[in-house]
């Protein structure tokens, strides 16, 4: 006798010669209209005892401890179904994680190559103190000034291209400002030595000095 409704339970015949997968296929063939996850007890009760009403069926399910409490053993895989999360990625399964380390690796290599190139350029500049940290802009400025110094030494033979004569000026200077100051000093010296007469225009400064200032 079965616990479900007091009806006799039909014996289940197990065929040991068939594998488990073939038995699951035969179960699915016997019940093609059974939805996934629904126990086989529903079809057995409806087909064997059509006089049972839905309330009696729900009461019969409550008598079974496996169906009432939701035992962990009663999952979809027990009835031939597929457990959630184990299917392919397009059917709700775990999606593969995309690796985005390629772009970061390329950027890291590019930064390392630039830093190594600037380090080699700093070693080529002479007369730089060892404890001085040069930025990239200062390194480029000193390199250009050293190249200009070497170009000036080409037509001369007095220093024979000695690198010790080059002075690395680390102070921040503006080339345009220095050039403007030199031009003003030369103009002032020429005007004072040539004549002492007063010129028309603004007093205190020569007229061409003011013209030069206005052009800036």
UniProtKB/Swiss-Prot annotation:
Matches recorded under Gene3D superfamilies? Helix-loop-helix DNA-binding domain (4.10.280.10)
Q: Which segments show compositional bias classed as Gly residues? A: 82-93
Could you tell me which SUPFAM superfamilies the record lists for this protein?
HLH, helix-loop-helix DNA-binding domain
bHLH domain spans which residues? Answer: 98-150
Please give the superkingdom of this protein's source. Answer: Eukaryota
Provide the GO MF annotations for this entry: DNA-binding transcription factor activity, RNA polymerase II-specific; protein dimerization activity; RNA polymerase II transcription regulatory region sequence-specific DNA binding
> Which keywords describe this protein according to UniProt?
Developmental protein, DNA-binding, Nucleus, Transcription, Transcription regulation
Extent of Basic residues compositional bias: 96-111
Residue ranges, annotated region (Disordered): 74-115
The answer to whether keyword Transcription applies is yes
Where in or outside the cell it occurs: the entry states: Nucleus
A Gene Ontology CC term for this entry? nucleus
What are the recorded Gene Ontology BP terms?
heart development; limb bud formation; polarity specification of anterior/posterior axis; regulation of transcription by RNA polymerase II
- Asked if the record carries the keyword Transcription, the reply is yes
Q: What is its main location?
A: nucleus
**Quaternary structure annotation from Swiss-Prot or TrEMBL:** Efficient DNA binding requires dimerization with another bHLH protein.
UniProt function note: Essential for cardiac morphogenesis. Binds DNA on E-box consensus sequence 5'-CANNTG-3'. Plays an important role in limb development, particularly in the establishment of anterior-posterior polarization of the limb bud.
Q: What is this protein called?
A: Heart- and neural crest derivatives-expressed protein 2
Supply the gene name: HAND2
